[in-house]
């Protein structure tokens, strides 16, 4: 757990984990949760989601086919991927780009899910220059494969889908609340009548910044 953040992880059914940790006794302005069935990695509590580091809380649905390239990249900066889950390298990429290199969270997301070169070639000139620099300078941070990611941090909450939208990611709003989930039905269990609901576009980050402490 990081500052002002708690993480509750275990191997088991989500409802049992919630009961064990008595989550009904906690209050927070932001929650991330994930019932994960590991496909290519062992099922153990260290790989359970949310995957946390310092003030990062990350949940991820999918498979990172660029894992080895991404792992070699972050290891140049002193990170070590030992926890047998590809979500680990996603977490280290965000930590490297935002905390250590000072980039904005949404800029880091644009690096991880950068557009294809033919899409960049069709962009307006100024935007084309920006994405050309990002793809060139951070080519080893580009994530390939089907994925949907939620990133919670002190900066805010970010949702990101792979460029081809091979994994489902839905967003909804009601009042001052925003919801993200892999399926619309999951959102409607918590919020049966959202005012807005839509699919998150592939490769387009949605960022919900947190209010300043005094404004909450």
Label for each model-derived stretch:
Residues 1-216:
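Conserved short alpha-helical segments that host acidic/polar catalytic motifs at enzyme active sites
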């Amino acid at each position: 757990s990081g500052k002002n953040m708690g993480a509750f992880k275990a191997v088991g059914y989500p409802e049992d984990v919630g009961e064990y940790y008595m989550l009904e006794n906690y209050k927070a302005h932001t929650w991330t949760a994930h019932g994960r069935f590991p496909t290519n990695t062992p099922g153990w509590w260290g790989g359970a989601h949310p995957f946390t580091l310092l003030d990062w809380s990350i949940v991820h649905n999918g498979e990172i086919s660029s894992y080895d390239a991404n792992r070699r990249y972050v290891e140049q900066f002193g990170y070590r991927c030992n926890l047998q889950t590809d979500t680990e390298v996603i977490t280290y990429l965000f930590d490297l780009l935002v905390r250590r290199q000072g980039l904005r969270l949404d800029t880091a997301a644009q690096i991880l899910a950068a557009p294809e070169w033919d899409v960049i070639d069709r962009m307006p000139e100024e935007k084309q220059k920006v994405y050309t620099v990002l793809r060139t300078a951070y080519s080893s941070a580009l994530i390939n494969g089907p994925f949907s990611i939620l990133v919670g941090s002190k900066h805010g909450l970010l949702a990101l889908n792979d460029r081809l939208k091979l994994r489902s990611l839905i967003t909804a709003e009601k009042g001052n609340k925003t919801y993200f989930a892999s399926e619309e039905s999951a959102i409607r269990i918590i919020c049966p009548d959202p005012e807005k609901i839509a699919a998150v576009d592939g490769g387009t980050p949605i960022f919900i910044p947190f209010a300043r402490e005094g404004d909450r």
